[in-house]
Amino acid sequence: GIDWPHSYAQTPSSIDRQKRELVAILDKLQKAGINQVLLQTRIRATTIYPSVYEPWDGCLSGRPGKSPGYDALAFAIDECHRRGMELHAWVVAIPVGKWNGAGCRNLRKRNLKMLKRIGDEGFLNPEMPQTAGYIADICEEIVRNYDVDGIHLDYIRYPENWNIKVTPTQGRSFITRIVKAIHDRIKPIKPYVKLSSAPIGKHDDLTRYQSYGWNAYRRVCQDAQGWLRDGLMDQLFPMMYFQGRQFFPFAIDWSENSYGRIVTPGLGIYFLSPKEKDWPLEIISREMHVLRQYGLGHAFFRSKFFTDNTKGIYDFTLKHNASPALVPPMTWASSTAPAAPTCLALGRNHVLTWQKMVTGGDIYYNVYSSPSHPVDITDGRNLIAARVSGNAVRVGNSDRMYYAVTAMNRYGVESGALQMEPRGDLSFTNPSATLSCDGRKLILPHSQEVWERNVVLLVTDVQGNPVLTSAWKGQTLDVSKIAPGVYHLYVLTSRGVRHRCGYFVIRR
């Protein structure tokens, strides 16, 4: 509700306008190489999807409790996945809004014991056992009903204005109880869904650098590094809205205590605004360079300042993210790689195609390219398309490039690479010849090299669209199920190189 939407959905046309606003944002994020989107899904005990527990937030329709006429979470998931980006449902955990607001009023009717009032604001009480179960209910509802890639917990801590009367150790145990309840609820359902949070940007005081009283571990009882160590969380987005000595030592601390999990520090790019702290771009760009050196990602808060190109941050990121990047694999959850794709071919109009794997789980594909063979998929600079859900991608107009494709499962684990063959390793007597076909059987051409290789036959129409693929078995190919017309025959080598054998005509 902060950066989107900018208009209310109250009629069919306004629904379309609201959707177009989100699409425009996602298009810009995709162009800049963003691979994860955190979408605020539970706002203040209110939601952007139809929930059995909590009312609609008013940011979509303009009226709290009123449906906008569509499921915003489902729409956003589809649009992110279409662009090769993960979508994580951002769940604000403890704050529930104004005491008399729609979300808090609903909770007061359900279970007043879970709530604590501070001024005119309401909060779920982390010290009450029911709180952990209730937030887990919300997260389970999202994971069961939506194809999210992650659950992201915001404000999973004691509020700064809460008079904490328990010991810090007890306080951390209460917050961790909530985290564990969510973990134990969602992981049996979809173990590949990442559980993450946005802790305070400084975990604790360091030996040489102080947090000046504002840290995750002691001040607000977040044992975030412990959550990584104990396997309760897969990823952290520490809110590192600082600079200089308040940033770099603490970023290194997060890196050194990641326990093999993913750490993606959040950068306070809103401070670039003249209305905020008017930071120069160099503060953020330097932080991005250092984070990359330490193998950490970066997240931007907020997206509006990014897509508005405040102080040139968007333009800088376009150059900084010169090639796509993959989210690190969840090897601690599963290290089993999917089978590699087959039948890699570069067709007309520079469209690279491959045969998708038949599998019970969701599989994505990553495409790599380089001027040398084989393509080195360990070099991130060779990645040209990530998390492709289909089996085709348009590549650059260059006959000097080689390509490779990997399959990737929901854990982010990649298969081995299907590589293009070096050019010119198969030959046919006359690739422009008319092949003999009686309308049902196609007589295959002879090439001594083919009989010694594991190749696949590919039949395309005159526009280059695949019509049939088959293993090369014997001296004929069954084309009885193909409609009459003119077709081209190719062989695809085991590494994906396409060689033209000729064309044939089916008449019946």
Question: Which positions does each model-derived feature cover?
Answer:
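C-terminal tail/sorting-segment detector
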Residues: L426-T429, I443-P445, P484-R508
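Pro/Thr/Ser/Gly-rich low-complexity, intrinsically disordered linker/stalk tracts
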Residues: I313-G361, Y411-S427
